[in-house]
């Protein structure tokens, strides 16, 4: 009879022989029952992830019947008082299996784990950035559109169709706008993760350049600590001067 450690090693394999599971089921040791229960929970979780991933790839699968290269686009940073809007365009291979989801539903650790896998396995990734000056000049919505067009232009493989999270991209390509696209499309979800990780890292860098605003934690959003820093230290070169609290500080 295998030891519990041996069973544990066998259950960690990619494929477990039915005979192993049958033997474990007949094993009267309490530890054996716990190992089997843990294995079954993992299998159920994996099956649920596969179903969810298939659901979130339904728009891609529809479009892949017509287009080989479908790019998902998303943005991060429309609401903050400081820093840029960052956009990403991602073309995923048809066999992509990583459990990407709306970046807001993932922890920072989960995003950082998925980020390199997206960069490695994607057919192409393009980044667009609209800094605070562009935002002040164009308005936040148009600046985001321009950054999205920039992200498409930076793809090393030309997309044939776009999936976009509730916006229109000013490029001459067929595009489908989805409400809550980052939760309903794996391509948009992947783009949201890439854009979020890049923007967060930028804001952490800015936190070192402009201490006193807590950029590393608030990412430029108008938190209590950020507003206190704005009152105490004034407006930095990365603040959006057209946004209310910043504009008010300039007038005071």
Swiss-Prot record:
Catalysed reaction equations from the record: Endonucleolytic cleavage to 5'-phosphomonoester
Annotated keywords: Cytoplasm, Endonuclease, Hydrolase, Manganese, Metal-binding, Nuclease
Cofactor binding annotation: Manganese or magnesium. Binds 1 divalent metal ion per monomer in the absence of substrate. May bind a second metal ion after substrate binding.
Residue ranges annotated for the RNase H type-2 domain, each copy included: 68-252
Family matches, as SUPFAM superfamilies: Ribonuclease H-like
Gene Ontology MF terms: manganese ion binding; RNA binding; RNA-DNA hybrid ribonuclease activity
InterPro entries: RNase_HII, RNase_HII/HIII, RNase_HII/HIII_dom, RNaseH-like_sf, RNaseH_sf
Swiss-Prot/TrEMBL cofactor(s): Mn(2+); Mg(2+)
Positions bound to a divalent metal cation: 74-75, 165
Key word Metal-binding present: yes
A family per Pfam: RNase_HII
Location, primary (coarse class): cytoplasm
Localization in the cell: Cytoplasm
HAMAP family in UniProt: RNase_HII_B
PANTHER family noted in UniProt: RIBONUCLEASE H2 SUBUNIT A, RIBONUCLEASE HII
NCBIfam families: PRK00015.1-1, PRK00015.1-3
Name of the protein described by the UniProt record: Ribonuclease HII
């Amino acid at each position: 009879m295998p030891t519990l450690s041996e069973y544990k090693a066998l259950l960690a394999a990619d494929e477990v022989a039915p005979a192993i599971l049958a033997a474990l089921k007949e094993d009267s040791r309490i530890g054996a029952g716990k190992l089997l229960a843990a294995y079954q929970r993992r299998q159920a979780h994996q099956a649920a992830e596969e179903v969810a991933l298939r659901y979130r790839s339904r728009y891609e699968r529809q479009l892949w019947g017509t287009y080989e290269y479908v790019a998902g686009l998303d943005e991060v940073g429309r609401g903050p008082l400081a820093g840029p809007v960052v956009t990403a365009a991602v073309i995923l291979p048809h066999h992509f299996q990583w459990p990407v989801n709306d970046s807001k539903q993932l922890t920072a650790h989960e995003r950082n784990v998925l980020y390199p896998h997206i960069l490695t396995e994607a057919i192409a990734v393009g980044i667009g950035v609209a800094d605070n000056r562009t935002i002040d000049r164009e308005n936040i919505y148009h600046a985001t559109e321009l950054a999205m067009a920039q992200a498409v232009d930076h793809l090393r493989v030309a997309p044939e169709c776009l999936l976009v999270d509730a916006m229109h991209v000013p490029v001459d390509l067929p595009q489908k706008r989805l409400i809550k696209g980052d939760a309903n499309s794996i391509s948009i979800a992947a783009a949201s993760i890439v854009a979020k990780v890049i923007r967060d890292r930028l804001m952490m860098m800015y936190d070192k350049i402009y201490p006193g605003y807590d950029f590393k934690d608030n990412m430029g959003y108008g938190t209590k600590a950020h507003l206190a820093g704005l009152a105490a230290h004034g407006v930095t070169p990365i603040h959006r001067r057209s946004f209310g609290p910043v504009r008010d500080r300039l007038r005071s």
